[in-house]
């Protein structure tokens, strides 16, 4: 069965390019920033499993998941 997910977008609205297909540490980090625990390189772009529409764009993901108290003094 296919696992749902999405290609996350960076600050410019582009997908994250990757060269090492499959297991990819860069993509895993990117997916964690976008609020999900796992992703990999597929068709030369990072794919994040279970990435919801609301977190595809990096700015939305940061707003939804950031816990930086300097950016968000009241916490998130």
Curated annotation (Swiss-Prot):
One of its GO terms (cellular component) is extracellular region. It comes from the Eukaryota. GO terms for molecular function: sodium channel inhibitor activity; toxin activity. It is found in: Secreted. Expressed by the venom gland. Has the structural arrangement of an alpha-helix connected to antiparallel beta-sheets by disulfide bonds (CS-alpha/beta). This is Toxin Acra III-1. It comes from Androctonus crassicauda (Arabian fat-tailed scorpion).
């Amino acid at each position: 069965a296919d696992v749902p997910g999405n290609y996350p977008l960076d600050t410019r609205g582009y997908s994250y390019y990757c060269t090492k297909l499959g297991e990819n540490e860069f993509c895993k980090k990117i997916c964690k920033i976008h609020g999900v625990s796992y992703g990999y390189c597929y068709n030369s772009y990072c794919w994040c499993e279970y990435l919801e529409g609301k977190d595809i764009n990096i700015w939305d993901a940061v707003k939804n998941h950031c816990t930086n108290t300097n950016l968000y003094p009241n916490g998130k």
